[in-house]
Regions:
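Long protein-protein interaction modules used by eukaryotic assembly/scaffold proteins
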Residues: 1, 81-83, 91-94, 101-107, ...
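Small/polar-rich, solvent-exposed N-terminal microdomains that initiate assembly or binding
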Residues: 1-64
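A broadly used, surface-exposed interaction patch
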Residues: 55-86
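"Short basic amphipathic alpha-helical interaction patches in structured regions
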Residues: 60-65, 96-104, 120-121
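Short, cationic low-complexity segments
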Residues: 69-77, 166-177
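Short, solvent-exposed beta-strand/turn "edge" segments of beta-rich domains on protein surfaces
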Residues: 71-77, 94, 140-142
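Oligomerization/assembly interface segments of phage tail-like spikes and tubes
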Residues: 74-91, 103, 146-155
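Acidic-leaning, charged glycine-interspersed low-complexity segments
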Residues: 100, 106-161
Length: 177
């Protein structure tokens, strides 16, 4: 599902950017940043930085009612957030163009904070990170810095729907004398 979400978002971003820049091969793609120094796709690259568990929803009980007084022991869904980086990966001679592309990408993020993939709604927002954290991220990605923004995609839910036990709740008490 992570691939579908990032691919869909990159496709929507590419469609938006194509209004301003006319490139038949497109301007947004999902990919690794800093994978090779000689590789400069001259595009806005959408890359996964981190997956984190969403904890604000609280802890759900593993017992779920499934109807007719029956219950099932099911693990609650895993709620996740995706931290992504949107980086304008251009060669040095096109630095000004990369800044323009980053500005247009931020306009897209601001104008489209919600999107739907396969019937599930997601939100995206920019994340503030310190200069030190940004430096650490770029060091992990290979050391080459590109103009970029870090965003968080919220509300990814992974549910295996595995039932570990089932049974019935008691109905009317039966008293034998």
């Amino acid at each position: 599902m992570i691939r579908k979400i990032l691919t869909y978002y990159a496709e929507q971003l590419d469609e938006y950017l194509s209004r301003f820049y006319h490139r038949p091969e497109g301007l947004a793609t999902v990919g690794m940043i800093g994978s090779a120094k000689e590789e400069r796709p001259n595009k806005m690259v959408v890359a996964l930085l981190n997956v984190e568990r969403e904890t604000s929803g609280g802890i759900s009980t593993p017992i779920q009612r499934i109807g007719d007084g029956r219950y099932a022991r099911m693990q609650p869904p895993l709620l996740l957030n995706l931290n992504i980086m949107l980086a304008a990966v251009f060669d040095e001679r096109q630095y000004a163009k990369s800044l323009s592309l980053l500005s247009d990408t931020m306009q897209f993020i601001q104008s489209m904070p919600k999107f739907t993939v396969e019937g599930m709604d997601y939100t995206i927002e920019m994340v503030n990170i310190s200069t030190q954290d940004m430096n650490n991220a770029w060091m992990l990605l290979g050391g080459q810095y590109y103009p970029s923004a870090v965003c968080k995609i919220r509300r990814l839910s992974i549910d295996g729907e595995s039932i570990t036990a089932s049974g019935r709740t008691s109905g009317k008490p039966v008293i034998k004398m």
